[in-house]
Amino acid sequence: MEEVISASLADIMLAMNGEKFFVENWKVEVTPAALTVVNTSEVPVQDPRCTIITLPFSVWSAMECMLCRFQPANQLHVACKLFDTTFILQNQDLDQSRYVVVETVVSDLKKPISFSLVSEGRALAEGELRLVLTPLRALDYVHVFSVIYNMHNELPPGLELASVTEYCGSLVKELCGTAIRTRANTYTMAFKWEGARQFYRVTNSYFCEQYNRFKIVRLCVKECKMYRKEGNVHVLDITVVGDTQPEMVHGVVSVMGAEVDSMLVTDRYISPLYNQAWGWALPLYAPTQVVVPPKKTLKVPVDGMFFRGTVPGAQPVCLIGGSNINPDLVVRPVVWKPMTSLVLTLYNNSERPLAIRRGDLAALAVPVNSTDIRTVYSDNSGTLITWDTGTCEPVEQEEEEEARA
């Protein structure tokens, strides 16, 4: 029992290699690198362009089925085994042409797994639909930082320097002071940072009323940009989400300079999106409000880019895909490379217009390493994965034909 408790998820999957379990009309088989999922009955295809299929289980419940072979699988056991793990869903057979499973980042581990299927329009026979559910670890977040820009503008009127507290033995500096709302959904703080680094990361934040420190203002930080002025003065622009946004709030924000070599540097700090087991991805938000018509595609440019870090030989890329949080919004999977712009191809798989507001989640970016083989990538634990090997062209071609008609 002690060996099982201390074993990692990879160890357990290796020990269970070849074992199978069934959930309704689906067979799940354990392999050392992934779970394969195969249909045991015919799968109807409702729409030849794109069909949403929902499996009768989640990643979490599948892990519970695996772990219960060794010990009672309570929530803590599952969370410990899945710690720092993100899951992706793909085709198992990449050389088949009858259907394409749109590669998806499974960001909600407790929600039944949903995916989009592009096919020829007829039902898939027993054993024909073969999926692979792969656990991977994104690049170590401790090596992900954001750049600091130079600033030549004046500080906003009335903005005072926040106090900076350093704790013994910690690299984190705590900023405590007034944050002024300078535009919609954006607050600005200023502070002095002696010996600041080239890169930084925000590690924590909370806000309360300016004159009542016991009343919390529920603002969630989405993005930050930091600027350096003369005299070691730094300015932090904080993009937030919250129903109540006073003109001024009292902010407590913890920042950390890059004391270790960076592998990936973003042009702004983006609060990572964690799943229930602390696997992480970078959320990509819609830069403006768009409406995707039913059964249509729309291309949406994404603000920003990222860069290679200072680690010698670092070759980071980001796997871009949709989330299982909103299955109606289908995102074409692509690989985002350093110092390039990104345009998302979004498809509305519902019968009604799909409104995406400015700041809504549009896609997820999972940072991994590139390899010498095209379309093959390596996660933080050395697992080799592929991405963007299929195509959603059947969807786009159908829409173009309708538009010409």
From Swiss-Prot:
Taken from the record, one Pfam family name reads Herpes_ORF11
User: Superkingdom of the source?
Assistant: Viruses
The record's annotation in InterPro entries points to: dUTPase-like_sf, Herpes_Orf11
Please give the name of this protein.
Uncharacterized gene 10 protein
